[in-house]
Structures are given as C-alpha cells and as structure tokens.
Regions:
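PAPS-dependent sulfotransferase catalytic core
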Residues: 1-57, 305-311
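Charged/polar, solvent-exposed surface patches and flexible loops
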Residues: 13, 41, 64, 68, ...
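Preference for short coil/turn "hinge" residues that link or interrupt alpha-helices
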Residues: 8, 152-153, 215
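Poly-acidic low-complexity segments
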Residues: 16, 20-35, 42, 54, ...
Length: 311
C-alpha cells in the first residue's frame, strides 16, 4: 500500500485500515475499495477533452473520476472536500485556484481541543510535535483565509448536542438538501463504525452524536497554570464562539498575570523533560522550545495592544 506524505513530511502507512475503512458495513466485514484501472481510464478520458488544464479543473476531474470508479452516477454540483490541516502554501494555493469556495471550520473548546490533540504525542514524549501543534492552533486564530473568504465556524458541541438544529442550518448555508444520511456515519453508502484510534471509540465512538469527546474534563496533561495561559490567549475566540462570557476587565488582568509566565516552562513541558531525562538548559535552548516561546510572546503582544485578533 502506497504511504501518504503528511504535512510534516513523514510517511503515513495504512491510513484507511487505521481509520476503520477496512471494517465497514452492517457486519463490519466489508472493505472500501476503488477500481484503480477504471479511475485512471476515466481521468485520462476527461483530460483528453481539454486542450489545457489548471489546478481547479484537474481537481474537479479527480472527483468525477472517483465517482465513476465507485459506480456513483449521481449528478453533483458541489464538492465537499476535506482539506484537513493544510500547510500555508496548500491553503493559499487552493484559495487562489478556487476563490468562490465556501469554507467550513469545525471548532471546539480550544483548551479541551488542545489537550485532546496533543495527547498521543505528549505520552510519546515528542515535544517538537506537541509544541508545533499548539503553535498551529494559536496561529489559526487570525488565519486570513477565513476573514477574506465565505467562511463559517461550526461548534462541535452544537453538532453533538443539537444536531436537529445545527445540521439544517448548515445545509441551508451550503445550499444542499437535508437528508437522513447526514445524520449517519457512512462511507460509500456503507456503515462506518468510527475511528478505532480514537480514545472514545469503545465508549461512544460509533455514535455520530456521542458526547464523550466534548464532556471530557481538562487536566490530564495541562495544569491549571497551563490552562490559564492558553485560555487567556484563546480569549477572543472563546468569546466569539460562546465558550465564555465577555469580561474585558478580567481578560486584562489575566493578560498581565500570564506575561511573566510565558518565559517560564509550562508544567506539561516539565513533564516531557522529566520523562526524557533531559537537561533543563539544553531543553530551553532547543529550537522547538524557542519557537514555541516566540509564538506565545507574539500572540501576547498582539492581544496586549489590540485586545483581540485581526479576524
């Protein structure tokens, strides 16, 4: 099986199997497949119909060829494309190629989301990846793509707790018809049982509206001090999406409180360093540590000056 290159340039192997795509169907005994020969032939046929191609036309052709390869002959006017965690070049290139694209961003309580996202790498002791993940989250707060394009943020909590209100509203914004299949977990019209790698898989990971992920208490990795720093830096986002009530005076107090804390190690950093039996000075001189500190301080400086982010 051909591996897929990730954003960090590492190769990911057997993604489909790891995400449960080899155990679909009512009896979990079916495998998602694509006829490579049919896909290639259809893509070549579509390409032969054009004297010249650009990235967007080819992008649409790939989807059309895929549909034919899985025997899906429904006429479709829209493409729902999961551009998961793209790097800056890929995202801006996509915007340039398709400026009329509508962007849907799934959002979640940021500190809870942060702890969930870094969990695996934290327990692996991979500080470089952990720090980069937090940098990515902080950098997304004023991503210019979402302010300049037709974009909407959908709270995971609303989708899980109020699907009968959230899904119809999203359908209206997207210009699609609400159907029962939108309330089901499926792939190629086959029942999908969820991602086996999810920590919630055995609890309610097979339920599309399971609430374990949004009910999990924060604190298994991030201490109260860690949470204070991050929640303060996420404050404008938290207010905008209703995770906290607006309280500007408290925010200003918290900003002042965390300023000296930014130059000290987070408690989760102490834990990783202890696990790796690293030297403190060496750890604090590492590129990952310095890059993380630079991002924290730049985010703080911006909030101190404007009390919000650009978008």
């Amino acid at each position: 099986i051909t591996p897929v290159q990730s954003k960090s340039k590492t190769l990911l192997h057997s993604i489909g199997r790891k995400e449960g795509m080899a155990n679909v169907g009512e009896q979990q005994d079916e495998v998602l497949t694509v006829d490579k020969k049919l896909f290639s032939e259809e893509l070549e046929r579509l390409m032969d119909c054009h004297n010249k191609l650009n990235a967007l036309v080819f992008f649409k052709m790939v989807h059309s060829a895929y549909n034919k390869a899985i025997n899906d002959f429904n006429q479709k006017k829209l493409i729902f494309y999961h551009i998961h965690n793209p790097d800056t070049y890929a995202q801006l290139n996509f915007v340039q190629s398709s400026p009329s694209t509508k962007w849907v961003m799934m959002v979640r309580d940021p500190v809870q989301n942060c702890e969930s996202w870094i969990r695996n790498k934290f327990f692996e002791g991979d500080y470089s990846d952990v720090s980069q993940m937090i940098i990515t989250m902080l950098s997304e707060l004023d991503n210019i793509v979402y302010s300049r394009q037709n974009a909407v943020g959908v709270r995971l909590e609303d989708l899980k707790e109020h699907p009968n209100k959230t899904i119809p509203a999203l359908c209206k914004w997207m210009g699609i018809e609400e159907k029962n299949s939108l309330y089901e977990m499926s792939a190629q019209s086959k029942k999908w049982w969820g991602d086996p790698s999810s920590p919630d898989y055995k609890k309610d990971g097979m339920n599309p509206f399971g609430k374990t992920s949004i009910s999990r208490q924060v604190g298994s990795i991030l201490s109260e001090n860690d949470q204070l720093i991050l929640s303060t830096l996420f404050y404008p986002f938290n207010v905008r999406f209703g995770y906290v009530e607006e309280n500007l005076e408290k925010f200003k107090i918290d900003l002042k409180a965390i300023k000296p804390m930014l130059r000290n190690m987070f408690d989760f950093e102490h834990a990783i360093m202890k696990q790796a039996e690293s030297d403190v000075d060496q750890f604090m001189k590492s590129g990952s540590y310095l890059s993380f500190r630079s991002t924290l301080i730049r985010r703080w400086d911006y909030l101190d000056k404007y009390l919000t982010y650009a978008n």
